[in-house]
Amino acid sequence: MAQRRTSGTNLFMTVLCVVAMCRAVPINELFERASQHSDKLHSLSTTLTQELDSHFPPIGRVIMPRPAMCHTSSLQTPIDKDQALQVSESDLMSLARSLLQAWSDPLVVLSSSASTLPHPAQSTIFNKIQEMQQYSKSLKDGLDVLSSKMGSPAQAITSLPYRGGTNLGHDKITKLINFNFLLSCLRRDSHKIDSFLKVLRCRAAKMQPEMC
């Protein structure tokens, strides 16, 4: 399984490198590959959230911060597909790249915290966080190439700094709550990234909006 994931990532980056040098691959195929990566990223975050929920203390659901506290909440984004379909290609790419960039540091925090997470599935969670980091890096590199083909508006990135610190808590419950909260923010943002890239994929393939 790990070998297949690595092979898929290598193939994706190989294709993008070819495009960067000779622009031989149609952009709709590149968006298809990017969409596959974003779909996997969102799938992993969803699976991890479900994994954590299976052993999440009841008090955690009461005191966990609300979604409005996520470090990316200040970014104005479409709230559904219909709104996303009204946004330009360049702006959608800029939004996707801004969100992806905003998770570079928090993913490191999640990875570091997962290594000592007080959870029965700690090893599985840690491995999936590592996998998410790989997909995130590969997708970021791919979107950098795609945005360069779309012009300067698509290359604009809104800074969304993470100020939550590297220590998610000293006691078991606090650490689980903060870890779950950060992961829930990632799940929400990975869904946005995936949705935006699927709209871009549809447009690149010249599909009808209702097919997106």
Curated annotation (Swiss-Prot):
Keywords: Disulfide bond, Hormone, Secreted, Signal. One of its GO terms (biological process) is response to nutrient levels. It is found in: Secreted. PROSITE patterns: SOMATOTROPIN_1, SOMATOTROPIN_2. InterPro entries: 4_helix_cytokine-like_core, Somatotropin/Prolactin, Somatotropin_CS. GO terms for molecular function: hormone activity. Pfam families: Hormone_1 (PF00103). This is Prolactin-1. It comes from Oreochromis mossambicus (Mozambique tilapia).
